[in-house]
Amino acid sequence: MKTLARCTVLAIAFAAALSATAPALAQMGNASDMPAAPTAKPLPSPPAVVTVDLNGQTITIHYNTPSMRGRKIMGGLVPYDKVWRTGANPATTLITPINLRIGRLKVPAGTYTLFTLPTDGIWKLIVSKKTGEWGIPYPEGSDLGRTDMRHKKLPAPQEVMSISFENIQPDSTELHIKWETTNQWVKIAAAK
């Protein structure tokens, strides 16, 4: 008998709760009438990947793409004469299954982090053996080496930083880093 009384009390409580929420549920209507969930905002510096095939092997660079957004970049956000992570967020990563020559630098097959040393003229590309970095601070003493880059001025400001491979040949290419009005580049070739 006690069990029947408890069940009756629970059923009455459930019915009361349901009747109290019925008007609210009725106002909600169909799920299709409900507003859409907010969409995620795009990342301010989204990730990017660029690849090139040299001698039948794929060289890959992973980086993040910061934007100018009205800021002075070279000599401002990216100060001269200080090592820069060359992108945003995680460090820029080079993956090569073959030995390369980047500028004057011999780079064995492997995974590396790319940094740059910007100046008002000739930059240096830094290939670091330390990987898995966020991008800053720069890991002093982990350089595989540094090589000079060449400089071209872009005819118009480029809003979003990019890394690209240009002038692609079967066994060589140029690595270009472009942002604002700066185009820094270096030749990359499959090592012989």
Region annotations inferred by a language model:
Residues 9-20:
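Bacterial N-terminal signal peptides
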